[in-house]
Amino acid sequence: MLSKQPRRTQRERSEATRSALVAAATALFAERGFHGTPAELVVGRAGVTSGALYHHFGDKRALFKSVLDAVEQRLAQRVASAARTGEDPWQRLELGVAEYLRACAEPEVRRIVLLDGPSVLGWEEWHAVDAGHHLRPLAAALAASMRAGQVDRRPPLPLARVLLGALTEAGLAAEEDAEGAQDAVRWLLTRLRRRPDDR
């Protein structure tokens, strides 16, 4: 006789519903954009009721914010994973930046993070989510390069803010001119790096 599957707890069912909504919304927002995706389409894709969406998130905007946070978290993990393959702090910084720019060309990141994020949430709320995932790791990478003598010493956090803003703009520009955006970022990074005779 087949053994019965253990019944899921209410908490497990709730988490499964929430995850299904986030997964469905992520795919649809990446494909159609926030404004082109009615809530009914999300719940249909997720296989849940409209009541479940409003119970877990309150409204479509709150669902979008959860989607944005999940996409940003995956992006930060990708950047960190790419950076870890570098042999020294500077190479890790370069590899992380390159991975960030590659990701910005993908529909999920481009549409959800760069385009709809600021317009749906407003710049301040979007920036809090975006910087929350990327600012301190970028500042830490810069600080490591400074300690290694590869970047002139200065407060790393303000420098990270400027560089993150430049990367966001480069990600937006990449759709029209990916090579030009990548070249601009490489040029910017070369200006940060100290020449061997300056060390």
Describe every region a protein language model picked out.
Residues M1-R32, G36-R45, A62-K65:
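Basic, helix-initiating cap at the start of DNA-binding domains
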Residues A46-F57:
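Short hydrophobic/aromatic patch on the recognition helix
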Residues K65-V71:
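Alpha-helical DNA-contacting segments of helix-turn-helix folds
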Residues S66, A80-E108, L159-L163:
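Hydrophobic alpha-helical connector segments
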Residues Q73-A76, L95, W123-A148, L157-R161, ...:
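Amphipathic alpha-helical packing segments from all-alpha helical-bundle domains
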Residues R102-E106, A139-A140, A144-R147, R161-E179, ...:
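Amphipathic C-terminal alpha-helical segment
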Residues C104-E124:
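Amphipathic alpha-helical segments used for helix-helix packing
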